[in-house]
């Protein structure tokens, strides 16, 4: 690690000789493979952007200049080059180094990211603010070709073209072919279009021609001729038509070429797109051959490439995927929709079985939901599978296009609740709060693997908008012997006693079982309720339990505001005087939740069995007096 030892703070890369950059890139790759193999994280995308990030750092000056990473999972090299190499020992751990850009982690991180297609808008904001304040800082954004399937990216490009602010947009193309390089002529045209002489001449000629009626006609003919030539030779014609200079494709592993290109681009005070071709997973054979598998990966053995994990058990995503195939077989009106998450949501199985009834719309959650609404209006039964963290992007479509029309759209919300080490931007803790107040929407959550299947059957039969929330990770097998029919608005009583009533929402049942065990060990009688319908109360059950219970506890995987417990507490307050009962919330008390393992996070917030038991015991004893 000879070269890497010289990088202790931002801008240190400028002290390294250009001829040594390839050696530094190799050391960075080796370092990334080592650290991600230990801690897990996003590997393939970071291996592919080493030279690209180095080239930007060689040209930019941090923290004055602003570099934004769309999505942000490809920012590891940026973190290394800004003095955070040693912090990789805590990558994605509680109170450790984030796997995404974080402004509170370093002044060199210009903008927090985690979701797709937002980067160009943020960079445009920085550029306009600079112009208004008379600054001279460079602004650049790195966005992947996958993120260009999100409509927001094009909204931002349109804005850039209109405002003409100086901003460099680097398209990191590691998969989807945007355009084909036609060799020397393409390179020659790129060099010309980046040159000052060309741009000054172009501006002068256009101004002169537009000064007269004849000149305008000549300009129109010239533009038509230019467009015909460029349409044949220049792969970025689409961007040129928007009014943004396009350069590329260029080799994303040729540091010298990228440095030269970036230097020229930053000198021009206008929006420029630089299309860079990279190889995802570069430098690690397993990641090159299986880039999707090594996109986000758990700790693994770097020699064999195999994940170091406990014996695999079925997860909720697997259960969902298998059940979807069965639903598709039984019901020909079932269609499946996802937003660039066919693998992650398990819908690849449905795609293989029923390719004509499967639709991956790309990173376009808004479109996915409105598309589903149209299908539902036409008599189909669409199942939209999206991660909780990304579903919030389609809020308006769920409300306006689905709920107000009471359309039969099934939302399969994967990664609901705490997801752990990806941090604030990926926790699935907000969906219930915004879904439960929508007209006609009902939200369910299964207590175990078996109930997820039953809820999907219920969702198919239900005539209206319905959402099912389930987490990442192993599917709970507990209470397999208790499978009562699902009835609208009704909770399920697992065991009934008196004194303490515990209401468990969805997969929190496993934690609830641990809580019940702790309380019963202290001779405290417990009623355990499987909530099932998180968006509504079973008031008939509550009225009965209020006669024999004094302590009411919820275990929830969502934020407190707008959660199930908030509704429960309000109902208790309406029906009782304060001295008659105690309510203890096991919902998430924080507005945002940092990275960490799920047990760590629950313990920190005191919403695990241990923390809740400590609150319950004294309250129960108080009511005995």
Please identify what each model-predicted range represents.
Residues 42-163, 333-334, 338-339, 347-348:
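Cofactor-binding active-site loop characterized by glycine-rich and histidine/acidic residues
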Residues 66, 278-280, 284-391, 397-406, ...:
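Non-catalytic terminal/interface segments that mediate subunit docking, oligomerization
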Residues 299-302, 307-312, 420-422, 442, ...:
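Peripheral docking tails and interdomain loops at the edges
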Residues 260-263, 295-296, 315-330, 346-352, ...:
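Glycine-/acidic-rich phosphate or pyrophosphate-binding loops and their flanking alpha/beta elements
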Residues 4, 175-320:
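Long, well-ordered, tryptophan-enriched scaffold segments
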Residues 87-97, 162-176, 197, 403-415:
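A glycine-rich helix N-cap at a beta->alpha junction
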Residues 1-81, 240, 244-246, 251-255, ...:
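N-terminal amphipathic, basic-rich helices that act as targeting or association modules
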Residues 218-286, 408-413, 432-481, 609-625:
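Structural signature of the thiamine diphosphate
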